[in-house]
């Protein structure tokens, strides 16, 4: 079957939820038996989001093959079964970098390099490569129609209709239809102007998804259809909902998938959304409620921890427990003390970089250890747990990470100088290496200790999880920490790197160097998060032993 392309654009305002809408549509098409993948085209000039501030951009989502990508790829993996790779996300910076590399190499035979055709051709080639082997590929174009940064991408997707055939391309435009309380009606004019802007580029949308805080009346949808030159059945009303996992059913109920399949001449069965119905049931029918404190440094933007927040919710689904997440600034723990941690059913310290707020995270790990509160540390959350244990249990008072104190007496966490990448090739780094793309990245296997809690949770001896870190436990000081009572529950396959630690003198204290949140999904959950949420509920009920 020839690959079909659905291009998803957004208008009127940013942050409309293009990624969620596109992923929900992909979930329906996948439920019809189609082989679906997704792509995100980002208009910023950074090569990738790896060195961008989480407070500006949100989290960096890491794929199995080690790509540092946009957080929307996390949504994609949570909604469809297809695993994302570095092919599924690229930026303006990445495209220009590749075109300039080819120009320096002489690939263009002395031609004058221009946005059209050289940049647009590179974009089209990447879209086609990313969609190879799939029935349908949904391509989300970042930004808002009208932004100057998005123009090369919009021109490229316009040209795709001629490249692969109009019968294999579908343009889906997401807009805002605001409600004005003063007049008591929804206003369609912003949508009309957004489509007009798209038409000026040469793209006629095939369908519109209209975001609003309420159902858009049929007469207003007919008006939008008339002025925007689309069939009425192709104007989809997408109202605000209390759970993003309800959106696939909402789109299906309006026949968007039928309309698209008919357009592509795809003969496939009706979508079976029973798995999503089960997710919605689990979310809506908890048998208890817990409050988990997440102690981090980027808490002013929850999207900086998007996958962790979603993974905690998934853990709640599988444990039939509603999870309330209390975001706590680690600097507040430093200034106000551990009193602000009282009343929590569990504590999670997520990943992060830099010295700011790290002592607050160490205090949180100590509070959880001493008060027998369930603790889950992720990446830096494992490192601070190791530092805390070394200082306060193993009598290594000056213990620290060389990231924060290069000359400390006990560098229990230190820079990894070499490791094997996902292809088995040796990677070497020093303190002077570039920050971008120089970490231990992607899926890595890990052997679990037979007597560990994590072995029981995972139910197997070897697991594969995704990494994103530059520092690791210092093996030269490890024996003293183990002798003080800390258990190494997981190691890399070559036995050189510590991947998971546990405290056997604590009812539920687990910390891992990898990022389990990247592989958690609403349908399957994740054993670490499900176990963590259950431990929080048992702690609340006084049942945690």
From Swiss-Prot:
Protein purpose: Catalyzes the ATP-dependent amination of UTP to CTP with either L-glutamine or ammonia as the source of nitrogen. Regulates intracellular CTP levels through interactions with the four ribonucleotide triphosphates.
Positions that bind ATP: 15-20, 72, 239-241
Activity control summary: Allosterically activated by GTP, when glutamine is the substrate; GTP has no effect on the reaction when ammonia is the substrate. The allosteric effector GTP functions by stabilizing the protein conformation that binds the tetrahedral intermediate(s) formed during glutamine hydrolysis. Inhibited by the product CTP, via allosteric rather than competitive inhibition.
Additional remark text: CTPSs have evolved a hybrid strategy for distinguishing between UTP and CTP. The overlapping regions of the product feedback inhibitory and substrate sites recognize a common feature in both compounds, the triphosphate moiety. To differentiate isosteric substrate and product pyrimidine rings, an additional pocket far from the expected kinase/ligase catalytic site, specifically recognizes the cytosine and ribose portions of the product inhibitor.
Pathway involvement of the protein, from the record: Pyrimidine metabolism; CTP biosynthesis via de novo pathway; CTP from UDP: step 2/2
GO cellular component, one term: cytosol
Residues holding UTP: 14, 187-192, 223
GO molecular function: ATP binding; CTP synthase activity; glutaminase activity; identical protein binding; metal ion binding
Domain Glutamine amidotransferase type-1 per the UniProt entry, residue ranges: 291-542
Disulfide-bonded cysteines: none
Subunit structure comment from the entry: Homotetramer.
Similarity-based family: Belongs to the CTP synthase family.
Name the record gives this protein: CTP synthase
Sites where the protein binds CTP: 14, 147-149, 187-192, 223
Amino acids binding L-glutamine: 352, 380-383, 403, 470
Stored InterPro entries: Class_I_gatase-like (IPR029062), CTP_synthase (IPR004468), CTP_synthase_N (IPR017456), GATASE (IPR017926), GATase1_CTP_Synthase (IPR033828), P-loop_NTPase (IPR027417)
UniProt entry tagged with the keyword Nucleus: no
Enzyme class: ligase
Record's catalysed reaction(s): UTP + L-glutamine + ATP + H2O = CTP + L-glutamate + ADP + phosphate + 2 H(+); L-glutamine + H2O = L-glutamate + NH4(+); UTP + NH4(+) + ATP = CTP + ADP + phosphate + 2 H(+)
Active-site feature positions: 379, 515, 517
Region (Amidoligase domain): 1-266
């Amino acid at each position: 079957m020839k690959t079909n392309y659905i291009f998803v654009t957004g208008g009127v305002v940013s942050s409309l939820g293009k990624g969620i809408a596109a992923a929900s549509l992909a979930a329906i098409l996948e439920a019809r038996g189609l082989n679906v993948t997704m792509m995100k085209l980002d208009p910023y000039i950074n090569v990738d989001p790896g060195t961008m501030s989480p407070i500006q951009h949100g989290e960096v989502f890491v794929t199995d093959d080690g790509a540092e990508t946009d957080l929307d790829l996390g949504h994609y993996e949570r909604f469809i079964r297809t695993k994302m790779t570095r092919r599924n996300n690229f930026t303006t910076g990445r495209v220009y970098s590749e075109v300039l590399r080819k120009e320096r190499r002489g690939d263009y035979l002395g031609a004058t390099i221009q946005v059209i055709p050289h940049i647009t051709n590179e974009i089209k080639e990447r879209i086609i490569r990313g969609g190879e082997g799939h029935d349908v590929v949904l391509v989300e174009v970042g930004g808002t129609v009208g932004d100057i940064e998005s123009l090369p991408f919009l021109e490229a997707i316009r040209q795709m209709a001629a490249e692969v055939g109009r019968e294999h391309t579908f343009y889906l435009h997401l807009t805002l239809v605001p409600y004005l309380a003063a007049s008591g009606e929804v206003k369609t004019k912003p949508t009309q102007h957004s489509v007009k802007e798209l038409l000026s580029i040469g793209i006629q949308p095939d369908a519109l998804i209209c975001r609003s805080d309420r159902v858009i009346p049929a007469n207003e949808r007919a008006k939008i259809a008339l002025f925007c030159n689309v069939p009425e059945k192709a104007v989809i009303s997408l109202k605000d909902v209390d759970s993003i996992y309800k959106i696939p059913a909402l789109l299906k109920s309006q026949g968007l998938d039928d309309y698209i399949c008919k357009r592509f001449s795809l003969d496939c069965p009706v979508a079976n959304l029973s798995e999503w119905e089960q997710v919605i049931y689990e979310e809506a029918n908890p048998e208890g409620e817990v409050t988990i404190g997440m102690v981090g440094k980027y808490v002013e933007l929850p999207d900086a921890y998007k996958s962790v927040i979603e993974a905690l919710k998934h853990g709640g689904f599988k444990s039939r427990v509603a999870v309330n997440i209390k975001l706590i600034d680690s600097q507040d723990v430093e200034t106000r003390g551990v009193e602000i941690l009282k009343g929590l059913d569990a504590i999670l310290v997520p990943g992060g970089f830099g010295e700011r707020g790290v002592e607050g995270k160490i205090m949180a790990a100590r509070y959880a250890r001493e008060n027998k509160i369930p603790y889950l540390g992720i990446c830096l959350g494992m490192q601070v747990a190791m530092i805390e244990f070394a200082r306060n249990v193993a009598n290594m008072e000056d213990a620290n990470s060389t990231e924060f104190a290069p000359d400390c007496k006990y560098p229990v966490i230190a820079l990894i100088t070499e490791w094997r990448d996902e292809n088995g090739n040796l990677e070497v780094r020093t303190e002077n290496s570039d920050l971008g793309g120089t970490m231990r990245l992607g899926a890595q296997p890990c052997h679990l200790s037979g007597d560990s809690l994590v072995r029981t949770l995972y139910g197997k001896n070897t697991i594969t999880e995704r990494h994103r870190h530059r520092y690791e436990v210092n093996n030269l000081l490890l024996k003293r920490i183990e002798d003080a009572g800390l258990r190494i529950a997981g190691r890399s396959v070559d036995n050189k790197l510590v991947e998971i630690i546990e405290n056997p003198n604590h009812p539920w204290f687990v910390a891992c160097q990898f990022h389990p949140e990247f592989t958690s999904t609403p349908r399957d959950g994740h054993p670490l998060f499900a176990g963590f949420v259950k431990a929080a509920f048992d702690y609340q009920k006084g049942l945690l032993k």
